[in-house]
Each structure stands twice: as C-alpha cells, then as structure tokens.
C-alpha cells in the first residue's frame, strides 16, 4: 500500500537555528551573507590527541530562554538543547 504524499503541502511559519555561524536568525544570516566560516580550531576541549583539530563548533550558546528551569537544562544533553532551542526560536519567529 503506497501513499503518494506529493500533493501534501507544508507551511513554514518560523525559523530557528543553532549553528557555528550564528545562534539566532539575524546573526546567522548576516554571517552567511558575509561569507563567515564557522570552521575553526577546536576550543571546547583539548583535541591535540586527535588527527583533526578543526571543527564547526557552536559557540556562545545559551539555552536558558528555551527551558523552564536550570534543572531542565542540566537534565538535557547539549545536542538536544540545540534542537529544543532551535524549535523554540522557530516558534518565537512564527509569532504564533
């Protein structure tokens, strides 16, 4: 039983980002347009034991606005925080 979903429509109501070139839409877009590169020497830990010491790290990330309490932030791993913050930002951007 195959479903053809090509006739389904999607409405994008808001955008949210957490990236190496910006953690909010304005910063992200300005850095993207300016050709800013998010790849740099790894600063979040000592990478000298690894073959590669460069990466696209998310810097200056503060998940606080997207979480109800500091306890919830502590319970959530960093990468889930990125997703939750991006979804929260998209909701804020949507104006819903």
Residue spans for each PLM region:
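Conserved "HGTGT" condensation-loop signature of ketosynthase/thiolase-family condensing enzymes
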Residues: 1-96
């Amino acid at each position: 039983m195959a479903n053809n979903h090509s006739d389904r429509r999607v409405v994008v109501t808001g955008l949210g980002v957490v990236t190496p070139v910006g953690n909010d839409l304005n910063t992200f877009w300005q850095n993207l347009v300016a050709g800013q590169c998010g790849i740099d020497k790894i600063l979040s830990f000592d990478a000298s034991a690894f073959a590669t010491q460069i990466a696209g790290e998310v810097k200056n990330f503060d998940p606080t606005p997207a979480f109800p309490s500091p306890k919830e932030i502590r319970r959530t791993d960093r990468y889930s925080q990125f997703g939750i913050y991006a979804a929260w930002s998209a909701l804020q951007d949507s104006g819903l």
